[in-house]
């Protein structure tokens, strides 16, 4: 950059700082890069697939899927994990369907959980915004976007047409709260439902409610599906679940994770630790027997998982090794890609300059 441009830029930056305060504009290289803080989802496989060890703080996340696919269970699991680290959590229950007993079984400290059951969509989003601006809440769940009914629709008659009201409400609210969420370093999760588009001949007819604004403002979008049943004999005790990361602004998207949700217990975390431990060579498997560091921990996956439940220190040790191995490998791969892209850009710049 020539001297005239440098002086002009310095003058502009000085004027911006005087008018808007120090730090309104900054050079990226002047500040050390910091990793994005994350909150665990309660599923080890999903944390690893997300690339940063969980859902990013200071961002909006959307979780959507069919009925009974595990959306609320996954969000309650996020709350339970956040509370273990002393976080303050809130649940905006627009569906008026939160079961405190079930939440307690998943590990949620119900006594410390802030709960709101708003009457209208405007009230729900205003409460969410006020909680965010308090800078005192770490995780907010909104369940669900489909239940955020505009006041005009509630006060109107059955059968009245209210075209686009909910979409406009969501668009306005997200414009307002996105900046506050970043400043408060708060994770806001919107649960959403699926609807079918009529007359779609090609591509998926599925869409989510509430317009397109949430799709743009969300840093992470998770598509959760029930893929099968978990059985003990003839009794169904849980569901096989697959989560696909449809959008991810903090790591590569389109990864997926599979895990089991056990009814009344939540995500089968010890089962994931066994499976990932075997795949990473941390847990030895010989026939039906599982062993860790030469010591047998159980015959069959269920018994091995039961052993980890009875010995949480060993389970935590294996999980820590899995996280370090897979998350560091992912970070190293991303750094390598970034360095390669930078080198390619330098080569192109040199070629353009005639070197």
UniProtKB/Swiss-Prot annotation:
ATP binds at residues 65-72. It is found in: Cytoplasm. The keyword Cytoplasm applies. It holds the Pfam family RecA. One of its GO terms (biological process) is DNA recombination. SMART domains: AAA. This is Protein RecA. It comes from Pseudomonas putida (strain ATCC 47054 / DSM 6125 / CFBP 8728 / NCIMB 11950 / KT2440).
């Amino acid at each position: 950059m020539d001297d005239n441009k440098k002086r002009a830029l310095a003058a502009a930056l000085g004027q911006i700082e005087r008018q808007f305060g120090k730090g309104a504009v900054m050079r990226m290289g002047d500040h050390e890069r910091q990793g994005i803080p994350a909150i665990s989802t309660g599923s080890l496989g999903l944390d690893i697939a997300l690339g940063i060890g969980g859902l990013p703080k200071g961002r909006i996340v959307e979780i959507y899927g069919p009925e009974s696919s595990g959306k609320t269970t996954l969000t309650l699991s996020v709350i339970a994990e956040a509370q273990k680290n002393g976080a303050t959590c809130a649940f905006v229950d627009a569906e008026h369907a939160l079961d405190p007993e079930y939440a307690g079984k998943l590990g949620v400290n119900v006594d410390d959980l802030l709960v709101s059951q708003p009457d209208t969509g405007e009230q729900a989003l205003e409460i969410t915004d006020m909680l965010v601006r308090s800078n005192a809440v770490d995780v907010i769940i909104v369940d669900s976007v489909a239940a955020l009914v505009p006041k005009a629709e509630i006060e109107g008659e059955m059968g009245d047409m209210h075209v686009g009201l909910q979409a406009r409400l969501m668009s306005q609210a997200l414009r307002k709260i996105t900046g506050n969420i970043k400043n408060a370093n708060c994770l806001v999760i919107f649960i959403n439902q699926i609807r079918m588009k009529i007359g779609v001949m090609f591509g998926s007819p599925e869409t989510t409610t509430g317009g397109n604004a949430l799709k743009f403002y969300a840093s992470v979008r998770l598509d959760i599906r029930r893929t099968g049943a978990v059985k003990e004999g003839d009794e169904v005790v849980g569901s096989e679940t697959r989560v696909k990361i449809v959008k991810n602004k903090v790591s590569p998207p389109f990864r997926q994770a599979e895990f089991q949700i056990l009814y009344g217990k939540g995500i089968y975390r010890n089962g994931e630790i066994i499976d990932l431990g075997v795949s990473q060579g941390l847990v030895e498997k010989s026939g039906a027997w599982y062993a860790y560091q030469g010591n047998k921990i159980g015959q069959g996956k269920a018994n091995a998982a039961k052993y980890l439940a009875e010995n949480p220190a060993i389970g935590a040790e294996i999980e820590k090794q899995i996280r370090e191995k897979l998350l560091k490998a992912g970070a190293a791969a991303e750094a390598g890609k970034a360095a390669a892209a930078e080198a390619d850009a330098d080569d192109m710049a040199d070629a353009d300059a005639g070197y």
